[in-house]
Amino acid sequence: MGSRSSHIALIPDVEHIRRETGFSQASLLRLYHRFQALDRDEKGFLSRLDLQQIGALAVNPLGDRIIDSFFPNGSQRLYFAGFARVLAYFRPIDEEDATLRDPKQPEPLNSRMNKLRFAFQLYDLDRDGKISRNEMLQVLRLMVGVQVTDEQLESITDRTVQEADEDGDGAVSFLEFTKSLEKMNIEQKMSIRILK
């Protein structure tokens, strides 16, 4: 790895990325090394194929959807800033930072609301602001695989949408999604401890 260095100053726009993501310099340096390791051809960016080589994503039923979140608007190249930005959603919430946060500043990427927005977009494939019954069925099918019959899966889907759908339109809006997850500790469930 001769040309690859471990100095923080080599990361393009490091200060901007640090402010946007909330990552410490040490965490950014670790992420940058991971980014470089995934960039086997030293192109300076990652492709979908590079991310598909990550074992945890390869076996995750939502792996393809998670990978899609790294490539917004049909982009084909993922630079380090985008890589760090998506991973920032999974950064644990630091209670001290939350209490000291300037309300005039944008909400941190790892806030409860932003974690929920990230999760919502994994379901809302057509980006219409609602999770349709069909979208919910697709996600549940990915998650349970062949462990349940199609009939059971249809029933689970109908019940899930029905319980969350407060306005009776047959779909789950973002507001309904957040209300349905009020009691869930999303801050913990959507955090990766190594991402501080």
Curated annotation (Swiss-Prot):
One of its GO terms (molecular function) is calcium ion binding. Its main location: cytoplasm. The gene is Chp2. PROSITE patterns: EF_HAND_1, EF_HAND_2. Interacts with PPP3CA. Interacts with SLC9A1/NHE1; the interaction occurs in a calcium-dependent manner. Interacts with SLC9A1/NHE1. The keyword Transport applies. Belongs to the calcineurin regulatory subunit family. CHP subfamily. PANTHER family: EG:114D9.1 PROTEIN-RELATED. Disulfide bonds: none annotated. Keywords: Calcium, Cell membrane, Cytoplasm, Lipoprotein, Membrane, Metal-binding, Myristate, Nucleus, Phosphoprotein, Protein transport, Repeat, Transport. The modification Phosphoserine is found at residue 27. A lipid is attached at residue 2 (N-myristoyl glycine). This is Calcineurin B homologous protein 2. Ca(2+) 1 binds at residues 124, 126, 128, 130, 135. GO terms for cellular component: cytoplasm; cytosol; nucleolus; nucleoplasm; nucleus; plasma membrane. A motif (Nuclear export signal) lies at residues 137-148. It comes from Mus musculus. Ca(2+) 2 binds at residues 165, 167, 169, 176. It is found in: Cytoplasm; Nucleus; Cell membrane. Residues 26-61, 71-106, 111-146, 152-187 form the EF-hand domain. The keyword Phosphoprotein applies.
